Amino acid sequence: MANTMNARPATRWYIAVFLAPAVFVYTMIMIVPLFGTLQMSFFKNGEGGLAFSGLDNFRTLFGDVRWSASFWNALANNCWFFVIHMLVQNPIGILLAALLSNPKLRLRNAYRTSIFLPTLLSFVIVGFIWKLILSPIWGVAPNLLDAIGLKSLFAPWLGKEAYALTTVALVSVWQFVGIPMMLIYAALLSIPDEVLEAAECDGITGVSQFWKIKLPLILPTIGIISILTFVGNFNAFDLVYTMQGALAGPNYATDILGTFLYRTFFGFQLQVGDPNMGSTIASVMFLIILTGVCVYLFFIQTRMRRYQF
């Protein structure tokens, strides 16, 4: 008995064995390139090759008129891109999840699948399809609007500076609205039946039950969706590149940090690529995303814990 009491717990070495391959792959694919990018941002090409420049690249990005104008334009567009997703995609996702969680709704599995299906498509497919649909020359959008008597509302939205970015953002919303819908749907299903039954006993049903009972309980999930939206939007590149090209036309109206980084790092047309300045932009993007995630984790999430079971 004494030997059993004093026996040390067995070392779970197998945990390290199973984690090692995943940690190694993640380190090689994510961590090493990240530190390599941060390192490149402190160097610049000189006459004798690469030379340490300290924060000169960052001073150029924020201090040089040409660089700073492009950066702030891309950052402002990225913020608007994020705002549209927060104001359109996530509320629609919550609404769809609330409707699909109703057990009386027929064919809800078919609706859920059809809404989530665009998420599985590649950016290239989605971008080209919507570019063809919205084309004023051979697109079907003018004919569809004409069929319902709204042809006067049609405009070359992708060709106008005032509407291009919003149009691309709405296409992105159409593609990814299934993700917040599924997460909210799962959160709604995880609410204990006892809570809902108690609410019904108190006369709280229907829409009132959603606002007073369900919504506060799914706030942590909404917070996770918001931070995922933030990270995804500030890493966005593929859809804008597919629909508007590397120049993010018209007149850089759809230029976001991802396309600005691409042109700077790899070059485009007459612009020569500068990997060091591109790494500087990537480092700033990383700091922006890191700041947003830290604000959520240390300030917002801690206030939402009281809603969790």
Language model features with spans:
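A structural signal for multi-pass alpha-helical bundles of membrane permease subunits
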Residues: 7-309
